[in-house]
Amino acid sequence: MPDMDELLDQVRKQTEEVQRIQRSVEAMEVKAHSRQNEVTVVLRGDGRFTSIDIDPRALRQYDARNISEIVLEAVNNGLQKLAEASSAKFAPVIESAKSIEA
């Protein structure tokens, strides 16, 4: 059984790794689109959107209600991509923690 110093060292290393990954996630940028690419959104890892671009043809083709639905679709797609990318970055730390618990 590992002694207390070894356990504390493991916890410290994992904490540092989590902080490093968190900084990496916050710095990443995710781009997503609506189904037919009428709307493109870009968001940062901290969840803030940095741009929402609407194709001018969509503005001529759809009414306000449809445009809002298309924007919402692109935003939700972006949030989903961000969640997946964040989970992928944190997966090694989570697996490592599980192996320590076992």
Regions found by a protein language model. Name each.
Residues 71-96:
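C-terminal structural segments of small proteins and small subunits
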Residues 39-41, 46-66:
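Amphipathic, hydrophobic secondary-structure cores in small proteins
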Residues 20-41:
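Structured beta-strand/loop patches that form or line metal/cofactor-binding pockets in enzymes
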Residues 1-14:
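N-terminal presequence-like segments and adjacent domain-start helices
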Residues 11-14, 18-21, 25, 75, ...:
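Amphipathic alpha-helical coiled-coil segments
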Residues 50-53, 91-102:
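Conserved "boundary/linchpin" sites in short secondary-structure elements
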